[in-house]
Structure formats: C-alpha cells, structure tokens
Regions:
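Conserved glycine-rich cofactor-binding loop
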Residues: 10, 15-19
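Substrate-binding pocket helix/loop in short-chain dehydrogenase/reductase
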Residues: 101-103, 107-112, 210
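Active-site helix of classical SDR
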Residues: 126, 162, 170
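Alpha-helical segment proximal to the catalytic Tyr-Lys
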Residues: 131, 175-176, 243
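Residue(s) in the substrate-gating loop at a strand-loop-helix junction
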Residues: 146
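Short, small/polar-rich loop/turn modules that mediate ligand/substrate recognition or access, typified
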Residues: 178, 183, 245-247
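C-terminal helical subdomain
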Residues: 186, 205-245, 252-254, 278-285
Length: 285
C-alpha cells in the first residue's frame, strides 16, 4: 500500500508508455515518486501521463527516447534529473523479442536487433544513470528480464539470450557499485497480460501450456499475471524497504518456473517443416 515512502524520488522508467512499464510508472508515482517515462511513441507516453494519478506529491513526465541511442538515453537521464532534482532509481523496462524459430533459421540482423534493444539498451541506461545515482548518495536500478532468461523457452531466438544477458549485467553491476550504495536487481515476468502477448491465441495450445504449467493459474480469473503485479515489485525494489537486496532476480510468474516453459513449435513447425525444426537446412538456403 502506498504510504509516500518514495516522495521526491526521481525515477526513470524506460518503455513507460504501455504495459509493464506504464504499471511500474504508476506504482512509483502513486507513492510520491517524480517519474519520467520514455519511449519511442509520444502518443503512448502522453496517454500514460494523462491516465496516471500520482499521490503524495508525485508526478509523471515524459520524454521521447530510443534506448538503443546513447544520445537519447543521456537526454532521458538528464530530463529525469531536471524534473526531480536528482536520480534515485531506474526501471529499465524497454525491450522486446522477435524471430521465433530454431537457431538454424535465425536471421542475423533480427537477432542482433533484439540483443541491441534489450542488452545494449539496458547497458546504456546503466552507464548514464550510475553517476547520477552516486551523486544522490545511492539508488536502485531494476532491469527487466523474463523467466525466459533462465528457463528453457525453445524457439524464442535471441530473446532468451538477451534476458539472460540482462541478469548477468545486473549481478556484475551490483558487485561493481555496491560500495556507492547503488543496487541492481532483475525482475523475471512470466506471462503477463500486455499488448506484447496479444499474439498468443487464448484458445490455442500455447496458451493452454502456460496454464498447465502455472501453479497459481487455477486461482486466477485469467490464469495469467497483470502488469500491476510487476509494477508492485518494481516499486518495492526502488524503495527503501529493499535496501539490503542487490544482485538478484525475482520471478513474477505465478510459479511457472517451477514447471516448464511454453512450447511455441505449434506456431512455427507448420511453416518450416519437421526437417528444418530438427536442424536441417531450409530447402531454399
């Protein structure tokens, strides 16, 4: 429950216009944080600013920025400091996937783009936020991973690799900057009801596999998590209650990591054929 513990905290949330990022921004602002959200689509950002109702003197601001651009990240951090007077936290939420399929058919350009968005984008946020948090006497950085970063998710291409990379970055940064009271942790969402997951038909086998492998699914009306579930954890990790937590990753997955990841082969195999799925070259290669 919000109690104003984040009053005056300057926090940057990347990818803050929709889904999980927006929920993180809301959870922070409701508790008094001065939140700056960034993303590539201004209309999504302004919609989020208009919809969020801050509390305890909090506020929400926005800046258009692409986390794969170092100049944009530098500007987003500067805007956060200008809005709040200092930087106390970052939720590096911007990310995404693409290129479903086995590794023998991965497109190099698409693979590199996913790594750049997730890993390089997060690194740029670390690079430019750390000096500001050190100047503030400390802070908290939350990297957005996924259960796909540590649990097998066949045919997810670069996404699993990218999320594992974010977790490795959070561990190393926690070790490097603990002396300056800057903490780094990762959140591992499972299936969360966001726009990004709308491509999974709710009446298909892939979604059914999520439900079968999520212990809490029968106790939920939808069987999946909500963005606010992730936002609540992000608020905790940014806040003072988590002062002695760093270098770890926390699941928000309804227990799915206890069982098995999804199998997306039903999406992919009809177009590729069993030979290609088994590792053979495509006929037109």
């Amino acid at each position: 429950m919000a109690d104003g513990a984040l009053r005056g905290y300057g926090v940057l949330v990347t990818g803050g216009g929709t889904g999980i990022g927006r929920a993180c921004a809301e959870a922070l602002a409701v508790d008094g944080a001065v939140v700056t959200i960034c993303g590539r689509t201004e209309s999504s950002l302004t919609d989020a600013v208009d919809a969020i109702r801050p509390g305890y003197g909090g506020s929400v601001h926005h800046v258009v920025a692409d986390v794969t651009s170092e100049d944009d990240v530098r500007a987003a951090v500067a805007a956060t400091v200008a809005n709040a007077g200092s930087l106390r936290g970052v939720v590096a939420n911007a990310g995404g996937g693409g290129g479903l399929g086995p590794y023998n058919v991965q497109d190099l350009g698409q693979f590199e783009a996913v790594l750049r968005l997730n890993v390089v984008g997060t690194m740029l946020c670390v690079k430019h936020s750390v000096p500001e948090m050190v100047a503030s006497g400390g802070g908290s950085f939350v990297g957005m991973s996924s259960i796909a970063g540590h649990q097998n998710h066949p045919h997810f291409g670069a996404y699993t690799v990218a999320k594992a990379g974010i977790e490795a970055m959070m561990r190393n940064a926690a070790d490097e900057f603990g002396r300056s009271n800057v903490r780094f942790n990762a959140i591992r969402p499972g299936f969360i009801a966001t726009e990004m997951m709308d491509f999974v038909p709710r009446d298909g086998e892939v979604f059914a596999s999520y439900l079968r492998n999520t212990p809490l699914a029968p106790a939920s009306d939808t069987g999946v998590g909500e963005p606010s579930d992730v936002g609540a954890l992000a608020r905790f990790l940014i806040g003072p209650e988590s002062r002695w937590i760093t270098g770890t990753a926390i699941n928000v997955d309804g227990g799915q990591a206890l069982r098995a990841g999804p199998n997306f082969s039903s999406f992919i195999a009809p177009g590729l054929g069993d030979d290609v799925m088994a590792g053979n070259r495509p006929a037109d290669d």
